[in-house]
Amino acid sequence: TAAVAVAGILASLKITKKPLKDNVFVFQGAGEASIGIATLLVMAMVETGISEADAIKRVWMVDSRGLIVKNRPSGGVTGHKMRFAQDHAPVDKLVDVIKKVKPTAIIGAAAVAGAFTEEILTTMANNNERPIVFALSNPTSKAECTAEQAYNVTKGKCVFASGSPFPAVTYNGKTFHPGQGNNAYIFPGIALATILCDIRSITEEVFLESAKLLANMVDDKSLSMGLVYPPLSRILQVSTDIAIGLINFAYKHKLAYHYPEPEDKRKFVESYQYDMSYKTFEPATYDWPDGLNSTECKV
């Protein structure tokens, strides 16, 4: 989940034109999904040259008790949440957090239906030229907002992705195709690379690398339609390319135990893949030509 979400964020930056380290993220929810996404985002920001402490300052989380801050009177800041507790006065409501923090991206992963209200979406649109809105909770009934709400309220400005499938939305003559952050984009490629080159430790760096590989597969045509993920119809190619990229990464970082290292990684991967589709064995049929519905026999 974290890798898919971060891939979507990285692809979104191709639309917003804002460097990753200059973004501010607010999470609706501070459970395992949000913590995982935030952790990978911090790693990605550190790779751009800023310190881990500065990266964490750009990640804000809101749980059922409000903004996660140090010494919160209502408590509940324990475990992994402590890492993302900010030096800030307590704030109870998500909308007030967004007004104070002015994030460039909001990410929902707590299954709180309707959490991204019209006021929140309007605020995001007012504060950003291209606000990032990721409503990742599923099923659809638990989504923080629908694609239609996001595009309509932000007047087509937002970069939207969801955890549940939503139909295309037309606003002001332009049709947007919401991207779905489906885990199926990531785990087949990771599993394939892990098995084929015998990766014995799947580190957080492996997940971040898979996110970067996936983000790089989103072409300009997809971005122009609002998509931050490649079409699911290309899942075989996506999985193959992620596996190849991760195999290169694994050998470079001494994570692979399959030797000798394959010279042609693509040929190596494809040699272990199977095409499960069946060719038809039915005889070909043709329409009978007009005018030949009767046969004459002359002696």
Predicted regions and their residues:
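Adenosine-phosphate binding glycine-rich loop
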Residues: 12-16, 131, 135-262, 284-285
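Generic recognition of stable, solvent-exposed alpha-helical segments in well-folded globular domains
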Residues: 4, 32, 36, 101, ...
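A glycine-rich phosphate-binding loop feature that marks nucleotide/adenosyl-phosphate handling sites
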Residues: 24-31, 58-65, 226-234, 261-272
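Short, solvent-exposed amphipathic alpha-helical segments in soluble enzyme
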Residues: 42-44, 121-127, 148-153, 176
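N-terminal Rossmann-like NAD(P) cofactor-binding subdomain of oxidoreductases
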Residues: 70, 85-91, 109-114, 120, ...
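Glycine-rich phosphate/diphosphate-binding loop of Rossmann-like nucleotide-binding domains
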Residues: 3-108, 257, 288
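Rossmann-fold NAD(P) dinucleotide-binding segment
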Residues: 93-103, 111-133
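N-terminal charge/polar-biased segments
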Residues: 168-169, 250-299
